[in-house]
Amino acid sequence: MIEDNSLGLEFKYLIVNDMDRKFGLWVNTVGYQSIPPDSPYPLKEHPSGYFFNAEKGRVLREYQLVYITKGRGLFSSDSTSEKQVCKGRLMVLFPGQWHTYRPLRQTGWTEYYIGFEGPMIDAIVDDAFLSQEQQILEIGLNEELVSLFSRALAVAEADKISAQQYLSGIVLHMIGMILSVSKNKVFEMSDVDQKIEQAKIIMNENVSGNVDPEELAMRLNISYSW
């Protein structure tokens, strides 16, 4: 587990054994990083298999879900022309597919991600529940999804017996939620609802620290009395 609160960085790369693979779905990595404006991207703390030059892109051997909760940036892949990604959007990455993404320097961004593979997810993709033709999904700000990423990080860090099976269940929960929310347009909340979700996410990210209510109100551009 690598954690650097000064950078807003936390991630875990997991060891997968033969028994984990028999389950049909396993997780290789899970993480969170907050990239301030005018910062290099990606951060160099990642292993060589994951670190990449955003100008050249990369090809992974796994699926990934990358959820943006703050800021904006750009994404492109073999099947997707360059598109803007902003808070509330989720990128789906596929194994063997070239892709690249990065935050805009003037905004930075906050991302949550989880990487996984296995025949279980292959079957889900083969049946077109997830598609390379639709790699950017509109989710909106969703505190429940952020909580699932946080739970996955906690499970990965504890690394107890059957942690991989626990993590696989979290991935399936995420996929089910993502499909439901994006297809039913549940993300189309009012501005007030979205600010409430954003406040929940900020408090979730600062669960071990103190969140000043007045400062939080200023960040959300609302009055403290509201």
Each predicted region: which residue ranges?
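Generic protein-terminus/edge-of-domain signal
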Residues: 1-83, 105
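Amphipathic alpha-helical segments enriched in hydrophobic/aromatic residues interleaved with Lys/Arg
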Residues: 15, 123-185, 201
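Short, leucine-enriched amphipathic alpha-helices that occur as contiguous helical runs
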Residues: 62, 192, 196-200
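Short acidic-glycine-tyrosine-enriched beta hairpin
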Residues: 79-94
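Ligand-binding loop in jelly-roll beta-barrel domains
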Residues: 82, 96-119
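Basic/polar phosphate-binding segments, predominantly the helix-turn-helix DNA-binding elements
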Residues: 177, 198, 204, 209-226
